[in-house]
């Protein structure tokens, strides 16, 4: 990407300083995975305040339906909890995907407490009604309760629809001592269909590269899309503004999106410095680039 894209020098200095902290040889513990569809069709950026939601990117689509939950401290019936949104469920789904792929098991051990999980993901940990612990708990609960339909090309021009709830079992319990943090179980279990699909379609990436952008969902999505798309290009790919808007715009109008997208792309590019990207009068040109994770280090080939 040309230096002229860095319109404000402070941006480049900030992002480069954050990324420089991770400049050490790539090792297996740095490699995480995500289902390829989730690197092309993304969760909402903000709370859509609806119970159904769909995002499309070319031949692939993902449709979400809010799941039902019940708080054991309440006598009320189950209720729809809402759809996951923002950066936190993106980080969590990457974590459970990484564990499943590396261990080759649908049963995934997780950290003993929510705060340990958050620190492992690089998130700040604050308590209170408006603290990060409560928001993290809510987003992960929304994600694990959500029903997914993954849609992609099928045989003879058809489209295949795979309905799945990625997590088969996930229990959160609430201690009677209010001074004790909300605890997590020692493991979760993915559904068989989702696990098999993940093994076949896992995209590797360097988790350290997410650290500078982990609080910005749109930059995370752009980075993950770049990591799976650019190494597979055999010729330059021009994406015009309407297509980019459909992919990454979310609820933004096209005009606002065109103002904001360059900043998010700069951030993602600094986390993937080998990505070859050029400005174009109608959008951006993407070119074949070295993968951020060499094939020799990939757990599933």
What are these regions (language model features)?
Residues 1-301:
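Charged, alpha-helix-forming regions
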């Amino acid at each position: 990407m040309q230096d002229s894209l860095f319109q404000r020098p402070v941006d480049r200095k900030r992002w480069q300083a954050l990324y420089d902290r991770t400049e050490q040889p790539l090792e297996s513990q740095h490699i995480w995975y995500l289902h390829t569809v989730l690197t092309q069709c993304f969760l909402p950026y903000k709370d859509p305040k609806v119970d159904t939601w769909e995002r499309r990117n070319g031949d692939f689509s993902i449709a979400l339906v809010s799941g039902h939950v019940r708080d054991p401290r309440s006598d009320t019936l189950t209720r729809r909890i809402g759809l996951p949104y923002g950066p936190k469920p993106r980080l969590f789904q990457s974590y459970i995907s990484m564990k499943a792929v590396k261990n080759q098991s649908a049963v995934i051990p997780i950290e003993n407490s929510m705060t340990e999980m958050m620190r492992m993901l690089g998130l700040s940990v604050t308590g209170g009604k408006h603290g990060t612990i409560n928001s993290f708990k809510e987003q992960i609960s929304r994600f694990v309760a959500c029903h997914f339909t993954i849609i992609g090309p099928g045989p003879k021009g058809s489209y295949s629809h795979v309905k799945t709830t990625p997590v088969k079992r996930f229990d959160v319990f609430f201690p009677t001592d209010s001074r004790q943090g909300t605890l997590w179980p020692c493991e979760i279990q993915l559904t068989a269909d989702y696990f098999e699909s993940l093994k076949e379609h896992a995209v590797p990436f360097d988790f350290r590269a997410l650290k500078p952008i982990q609080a910005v969902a749109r930059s995370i999505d752009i980075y993950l899309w770049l990591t799976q798309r650019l190494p597979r290009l055999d010729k330059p790919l021009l994406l015009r503004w309407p297509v980019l808007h459909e992919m990454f715009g979310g609820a933004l109008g096209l005009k606002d999106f065109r103002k904001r997208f360059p900043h998010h792309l700069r951030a993602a590019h600094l986390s993937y410095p080998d990505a070859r990207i050029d400005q174009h009068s109608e959008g951006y040109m993407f070119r074949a680039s070295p993968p951020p994770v060499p094939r020799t280090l990939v757990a599933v080939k």
